[in-house]
Amino acid sequence: MAYRRRKKKVKKCRLCEMKLDYVDYKDTRLLSEFLTDKGKIIPKRLTGTCAKHQRMVKVAIKRARQMGLLPYLKI
């Protein structure tokens, strides 16, 4: 019995499509899309962001957490 391989759906970086050069830590609406319901950062293999923008998102989320704009944990 032969198994068929699933074709992986190629996810495109939404931030590249929006042509963002900088991810602002004050944009909590955008940053909350990259967080789980418990407040953890979603990895790039699930979000589809490129490595450059994933690093920017990571730094922006950590800055927003330190400023008190985003929670560390959601209970």
Swiss-Prot record:
One of its GO terms (biological process) is translation. Belongs to the bacterial ribosomal protein bS18 family. Part of the 30S ribosomal subunit. Forms a tight heterodimer with protein bS6. It comes from the Bacteria. This is Small ribosomal subunit protein bS18. The keyword Flavoprotein does not apply. Binds as a heterodimer with protein bS6 to the central domain of the 16S rRNA, where it helps stabilize the platform of the 30S subunit. Keywords: Ribonucleoprotein, Ribosomal protein, RNA-binding, rRNA-binding. It holds the Pfam family Ribosomal_S18. One of its GO terms (cellular component) is cytosolic small ribosomal subunit. It comes from Thermotoga sp. (strain RQ2). The keyword Nucleotide-binding does not apply. The gene is rpsR. One of its GO terms (molecular function) is small ribosomal subunit rRNA binding. PROSITE patterns: RIBOSOMAL_S18.
